[in-house]
From Swiss-Prot:
Residues 1-84 are annotated as: Disordered. This is Protein Nef. Residues 70-80 have a biased composition (Acidic residues). Residues 1-10 have a biased composition (Basic residues). Homodimer. Interacts with host CD247/TCRZ; this interaction induces down-regulation of cell surface TCR/CD3 complexes.
């Protein structure tokens, strides 16, 4: 029974991965393996030291013709809603254990590592977790930035890491890949940074978001209201 359940879950996870990668219309959307390996070898370095992303699959069929425009127009209905129409399990809140387990499961299935972050993919993840796992959305939040964005939910082991895309690379990718996710990612970010997901197992033990940026948790930070609001203001973050 357990084996069959794991197989079905793996199949659903593969469906999520395909949605995130927008297969087959655009067969790209993550940092290439070589550059992802180079980035992972320098976890302590600043975001400016990370290597720039390359355009995967730029010569594949999704980069030719007008398939991309059609995919964009049906984005909301086809990518977000089509994962599952209604929840298949009872709804429940996210917990630390669930977050850790799901983080590792996604990593084992090759889901998010090196993939460009965007609001659209954020929504796809929310929809998947709610409909397939019954986890109520609203837990997937990250620190404000700029720089590395740490998950604000303790137990979620995927952080967002900025990568640099040189102007020459942007022009080349726009020519060969139409609208590459690297461009979309920077549009979605208030600081204009291009972000990728990166797995960090140490986040299961170190609540980095809270320890470094307690002001972002507002009244839950334990700080006096005047202090956490002053910290947010100094960083240019709205306090309303």
């Amino acid at each position: 029974m357990g084996s069959a359940g794991s197989k079905k879950r793996s199949e659903r996870q593969q469906g999520l991965r395909e949605k995130l990668l927008r297969v087959p219309e655009r067969p790209y959307g993550r940092l290439s393996g070589e550059r992802r390996e180079q980035s992972s070898r320098s976890p302590g370095e600043s975001d400016k030291d990370l290597n720039s992303p390359s355009c995967e699959g730029q010569n594949a069929r999704g980069a030719e013709g007008g398939g991309q425009q059609d995919a964009d127009e049906s984005d909301e209905d086809d990518e977000v809603g089509a994962i599952c129409k209604t929840p298949i399990v009872p709804l429940r809140p996210m917990t630390y254990k669930l977050a850790v387990d799901m983080s590792h499961f996604i990593k084992e299935q090759g889901g998010l590592e090196g993939m460009y972050y965007s609001e659209r993919r954020h929504r796809i993840l929310d929809t998947y977790f709610e409909n397939e796992e019954g986890i109520v959305s609203g837990w997937q939040n990250y620190t404000h930035g700029p720089g590395i964005r740490y998950p604000k939910y303790f137990g979620w082991l995927w952080k967002l890491v900025p990568v640099e895309v040189p102007a020459a690379t942007r022009e080349e990718e726009e020519t060969h890949c139409l609208m590459h996710p690297a461009q979309i990612s920077s549009w979605d970010d208030i600081h204009g940074e291009t972000l990728i997901w990166q797995f960090d197992s140490l986040l299961a033990y170190d609540y980095v978001a809270f320890n470094r940026f307690p002001e972002e948790f507002g009244y839950q930070s334990g700080l006096p209201e005047e202090e956490w609001k002053a910290r947010l203001k100094a960083r240019g973050i709205p306090t309303d």
